[in-house]
Design a protein with these regions (language model features):
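One face of beta-strands
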Residues: 27-31, 82-84, 97-101, 139, ...
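In a subset of proteins, long, contiguous C-terminal domains/tails are tracked
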Residues: 9-11, 468-537
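Short Gly/Thr-rich strand-loop-strand
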Residues: 73-80, 93, 103-144, 181, ...
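Long compositionally biased, domain-poor regions of proteins
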Residues: 79-86, 336-362, 373-384, 388-399, ...
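A conserved glycine-rich beta-strand in the N-terminal activation segment of trypsin-fold
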Residues: 131-209, 422-500
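Structural boundary/hinge residues at secondary-structure and domain interfaces
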Residues: 21-135, 170-242, 257-362, 386-398
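Bacterial N-terminal signal peptides
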Residues: 5-16
Length: 537
């Protein structure tokens, strides 16, 4: 902890120093970190997740022994949060960074620097200057408003008129362990212009470099991606308002979260794009919320019209590459097959729902997929044309094996032992409509019928992905010992057959803001950590 205080000061020097106007402009960048007292139980909780509970407990107890009721931890107050602010100016290298360390006792803090860190702070009026090894510029700090307020290079940054008052800064409480906010609408226009100009030059240099073995289609794709970046990045920087990142670990809910949010300036094209991501309908969900989902993915994403239109010649080149690289005997079929799926790819829209669900008995699983098609009946024609000619050694294809609500269902039975081992069946059921493909791996076809009869998802988010940690490994590692899995499940959950609280979820939502949230339950991380440790023994 003694090193932590000076580490924060040294960390600030990496950002350079800033200049502010007399009226104290609001910070461009704000960072708030919870108090030591709040961080200690979080540290112990996270250590336990990674199967290091004893080490975490000892670390917390050690830090508590360093805490004094009057002087805190070497002068640092463990009951109040830490902070940093940056007010960006046109001259970026001269922009001040202000670091705020909660102060318990001035003398104890100076003793930390002089006696324990072997530094020599020198005082001029109320400002201290200290040379820190491996830091090219001097560090300045003063005691004010109950905090150690520090900066680098320019002592004038510490004048009260040059930075947001500490009380005002911490009126906004940290929303998690750490809370970072970047106000894009406060970035000086000149800085944005310079950043964009440098980015464009760098991008042009990279795109101009030849790539060994690159096909015509691959080159067109690379150039297309570069062109889209030169459109998207300026929009984000010029029309963006706030970008925030919040990290949290909550022992009560047993959850680790990373929450990223991005908002746009009102009335901009970017704000309209974000708003359009909300309140859309999508294909029916193929899994129930209360099902034993191993993996569930739902997506509704699409390229903007201009990007989609510019992608068409790129797609043509990629498909041509694919055909040319195939064996001569396969090209005829490939051309027909690619022509059938090309309209769907050209639409550049991903509207899908997929799931891998375990049966209640744990002995079988169901795979389900539903995705949007464009001119899907062309694919249906291919199935009817080539399906009956599937070699018997590979399996059996049955056209019109079943039907529900006017939807024809075909059945494909593959001679695949691995498929049967994992899912308890080798039967694949599929239905192809002009606007939709539905597919399941299941014994009797009951699930595909339910999906085809289901109503559309009225609130389709751009992306949601949910996984269950204790059920995933057997599907991704065929050599994993089933007995080892049971042992680890029992160690983490008590009863391996009733493992709960081990989900991992990623969600992307739109509306007033674009929000990317990653939530992992602690038991999920612990299960994977213990499994990794046990597998290496």
């Amino acid at each position: 902890m003694r090193l932590a205080a000076v580490s924060v000061i040294v960390f600030a020097t990496l950002f350079g120093s800033i200049a502010r106007s007399a009226e104290v402009p609001p910070p461009t960048v704000e960072l708030r970190i919870q108090s030591v007292n709040q961080l200690l139980p979080t540290f112990e909780y996270v250590a336990g997740i990674f199967n290091q509970a004893e080490a975490g407990k000892q670390g917390v107890e050690f830090l508590k022994t360093l805490t004094d009721d009057k002087t805190g931890i070497d002068g640092i107050d463990p009951a109040r949060p830490f902070g940093m602010s940056i007010a960006l100016t046109k001259d970026v290298v001269d922009s001040p960074v202000i670091v705020m360390l909660p102060l318990a006792d001035e003398a104890a803090f100076l003793d930390l620097l002089r006696d324990k860190l072997d530094l020599d702070p020198k005082k001029t009026k109320d400002v201290y200057e200290v040379e820190v090894p491996n830091v090219p510029a001097p560090v300045f700090f003063r005691f004010t408003q109950g905090y150690v307020v520090a900066t680098v290079q320019n002592a004038g940054n510490l004048n009260d008129a040059k930075f947001l008052p500490v009380k005002e800064f911490f009126a906004v409480k940290p929303q998690g362990i750490a809370d970072l906010r970047v106000h894009l609408d406060r970035v000086p226009e000149d800085v944005t212009k310079v950043v964009l100009a440098q980015l464009e030059l760098k991008l042009q240099d990279e795109l101009a470099k030849p790539m060994d073995g690159e096909t015509v289609g691959q080159k067109k794709l690379r150039l297309w991606v570069g062109e889209r970046l030169t459109e998207v990045v300026p929009m984000l920087l010029k029309q963006g308002k706030l970008l925030s990142l919040t990290l949290n670990a909550d022992a009560k809910s047993d959850a680790l979260t990373t929450d990223v949010r991005f908002s746009a300036k009102d009335g901009t094209a970017l704000a309209d794009i974000l708003a359009a991501l909300d309140g859309r309908s999508g294909l029916p969900l193929v899994s129930d919320a209360d099902a034993l989902n191993v993996l569930a993915l739902n997506a509704k994403l699409a390229l903007p019209t201009q990007a989609r239109e510019s992608f068409e010649p790129v797609l043509e080149a990629l498909l041509k590459d694919f055909v040319e690289q195939a064996k001569e005997s396969e090209r005829g079929f490939l051309i027909v097959a690619l022509d059938a799926i090309k309209p769907t790819i050209q639409a550049a829209e991903l509207d899908m729902s997929a799931a891998l669900v375990d049966a209640a008995d744990g002995k079988s699983s169901t795979v389900a997929l539903s995705m949007k098609l464009v001119k899907g009946l062309e694919i249906e024609k291919l199935l009817k044309l080539f399906g009956p000619f599937l070699p018997s050694k590979q399996g059996k294809f049955t056209l019109n094996a079943d039907k529900v609500d006017g939807n024809v269902i075909h059945k494909l039975e593959l001679n695949d032992d691995r498929l049967k081992t994992l899912y308890g069946t080798n039967a694949i059921w599929l239905s192809v409509r002009d606007d939709r493909l539905t597919l399941t791996v299941e014994p009797d076809g009951s699930r595909i019928k339910a999906i085809l009869a289901a109503k559309p998802n009225a609130a389709a988010a751009p992306l949601t992905l949910r996984a269950t940690a204790s059920r995933l490994p057997k599907y991704f590692d065929s050599k994993l010992d089933a007995k080892l899995l049971d042992v680890v499940r029992t160690e983490v959950f008590g009863d391996g057959k009733k493992a709960t609280g081990d989900t991992m979820e990623v969600s992307l939502t739109g509306g007033k803001e674009l929000r990317l949230k990653l939530t992992t339950q602690g038991k999920a991380v612990k299960f994977l950590a213990v499994l990794d440790q046990e597998s290496k023994k």
